[in-house]
Amino acid sequence: MHFTKLDDSPMFRKQLQSMEESAEILRERSLKFYKGCRKYTEGLGEAYDGDIAFASALETFGGGHNDPISVAFGGPVMTKFTIALREIGTYKEVLRSQVEHILNDRLLQFANMDLHEVKEARKRFDKASLTYDQAREKFLSLRKGTKSDVAAALEQELHTSRSMFEQARFNLVTALSNVEAKKRFEFLEAVSGTMDAHLRYFKQGYELLHQMEPYINQVLTYAQQSRERSNYEQAALNEKMQEYKRQVDRESRWGSNGSNGSPNGDGIQAIGRSSHKMIDAVMQSAARGKVQTIRQGYLSKRSSNLRGDWKRRFFVLDSRGMLYYYRKQCSKPSGSGSQLSGQRNSSELGSGLLSRWLSSNNHGHGGVHDEKSVARHTVNLLTSTIKVDADQSDLRFCFRIISPTKNYTLQAESALDQMDWIEKITGVIASLLSSQVPEQRLPGSPMGSGHHRSASESSSYESSEYDHPTTEEFVCERSFLGYNERPSRSFQPQRSIRKGEKPIDALRKVCGNDKCADCGAPEPDWASLNLGVLVCIECSGVHRNLGVHISKVRSLTLDVKVWEPSVISLFQALGNTFANTVWEELLHSRSAIHFDPGLTVSDKSRVMVTGKPSYADMISIKEKYIQAKYAEKLFVRRSRDSDFPQSAAQQMWDAVSGNDKKAVYRLIVNGDADVNYVYDQTSSSSLTLSRVILVPERPKREDVLLRLRNELLDRTGSSSNISPEGSGGSSLLHCACEKADLGMVELLLQYGANVNASDSSGQTPLHCCLLRGKVTIARLLLTRGADPEAMNREGKTALDIAAESNFTDPEVLALLSDTNGYNHRQC
């Protein structure tokens, strides 16, 4: 108790005064504290505005998914961080509101109401005390002879004033007691409540960022990998530039030390057999509308006017036999073609960057071209010949192209450059003459019909890499084997990515790929290449911890280069729904658990009590489930020998022959089938033939084998298919290269198929592709480590086989020639 006695006494008055002084000091302190708290809340408000401004700036900087510049530096990834930043800003705004309500408002109320009430009570007490003193003096100053009614009135006034005085005194005591009581809890409660608000603020922020930690780590890892790749690419670029400088120096020294003149000879010069073959192969590609650049670079051209001045022009020799040049330097286009105007020489017999750029401009601009980007048609080489040196000119490195309509005098920049131009033009003329292409079928200009190619043959990224690989391969196979009937079901074109469609959009259309294969989270944006499933970012972190021997995790949005046509074809053939029927078969079929021979008693009990997690479950639950699902194969039903009359190897062979990716996938997962299984001559080659094993009488079996083989040869018109008599030592990859498609080859490679395996004839899968015109599969094998220098039993390499089998794909030929020493590119 603050007041032991309530009697009005000097000690009581002194105690009141002391408490009032303490209350006034507390009021001043409270107001100062309030000013500091208000400044703090204003700072929180400014910090919230700063957070929102930072998030908005990051969102603007990151751009959108359709912005190519944004995608190049990871803008879509950064945009995801803006959501977290805005959420953190919201937490900060909530903190500011709580501090203002819990601390600022209570401080202001305590100072302006509770402490102010003490002052008001003191004023009322002083006024009542004065009134009471006056009434008491009047009453005590009465004489004895005062009338009774006057005395009664003064006595009543004294009683009233005393009551008012006592009431005012107790009101002051109440106000002071209230202040003293609130001192014990008001400030502690306000400050501790403020700290609790801070605790919740930081806890919410931690939980939010902790949930994003796997994604942040993935982005950091990807950024580090990108840094390493960039350093490697920069070093490779520097090496290329140094090599270019060394090549220029060698050419300069060769030109200065060599002949001052030019080689003599008229007409068509003899060129190397290998170079002639390669030029001829590229020339043949023009028949399918694929225009390739054989040679391009700068030449000086003498004008036909009286002055005969020389002007530097950029000439292009393409696979249609056309030689044309640019009147002016190319205007800077969008895309990779922007650097062509500064390029002296380019790769030959390659992909033809300039023709690609011209083609893309034709399709992209509807044939309307600026003068700066239009190539001027020069000459049809079919009716032309070459003469070395200029007519009546003592200049070095000159040569002439003589045609029925016009003569062109050209000057190269060195003797080596001159010889190379003459060799390439001579080779083109020889190829044109040998093929006897009618004059009227040749395009009239570089911008003519030769460039009006279909979308599937465009050189853009979307069309060149993703447009109908199965269809293209089948057309090539028909041209090699002479098929006349309709293609079988196994070679029907699969679903492919439409032009401009992103891999993530195409793969999410596959059954079950709209949800994570492991937890069911919507819109998964990560994938396991070898498992063929789409997973969310949280499950992808668990997959990464399993190791690449179990799951090869890649991002659908970050790892753009991974999503080749073969990988996309494989994913479209599988899907999360099918993959889970293999990996979770026992999980959804409890009755099969008791009959699975591969499960122990403890494993069976684990399967019975284990359930599939949801995306809201803790990461530890998902880790245990994914570990059991893929690493331990706890929910996979093991294949038994009694399930099928055939061996696992024979089933694999039949599935690959039938292009049944799902069956191959199931056999690999269920029975750990050997993808490097080698076909034995004593085994059968197809599901139809394998059924003959069940026939009891051997003579009848042999008759059926012979009849089926003859029917097979009658249908195809060729004996190139793998058969029991001619497939000794063939691997599953050999079989896939001949009978399956790109996705099947990708599936076998993902599970460790030997890309350089050879059969009894020494033929590798690459050799088989070249023999049968499998263009896309040949490209895939070369990019996955196929050895172009491997020889068969006859000592022939892949390039030799391609030359003999009239294989005409320029990209594959360029890859083969680079390895075998036929690289004719001028750096």
Swiss-Prot record:
Pfam families: Ank_2, ArfGap, BAR_3, PH. The modification Phosphoserine is found at S445. GO terms for biological process: endocytosis; leaf morphogenesis; phloem or xylem histogenesis; response to auxin; xylem and phloem pattern formation. CDD domains: ArfGap (cd08204), BAR_SFC_plant (cd07606), PH_ACAP (cd13250). It comes from Arabidopsis thaliana. ANK repeats lie at residues 728-757, 761-790, 794-825. Residues 246-269, 439-467 are annotated as: Disordered. The keyword Coiled coil applies. Binds to phosphatidylinositol (PI), phosphatidylinositol 4-monophosphate (PIP) and phosphatidylinositol 4,5-bisphosphate (PIP2) but not to phosphatidic acid (PA), phosphatidylcholine (PC) or phosphatidylethanolamine (PE). Residues 1-225 form the BAR domain. Residues 292-430 form the PH domain. It comes from the Eukaryota. The PH domain is responsive of the binding to phosphoinositol. The BAR domain is required and sufficient for homodimerization. This is ADP-ribosylation factor GTPase-activating protein AGD3.
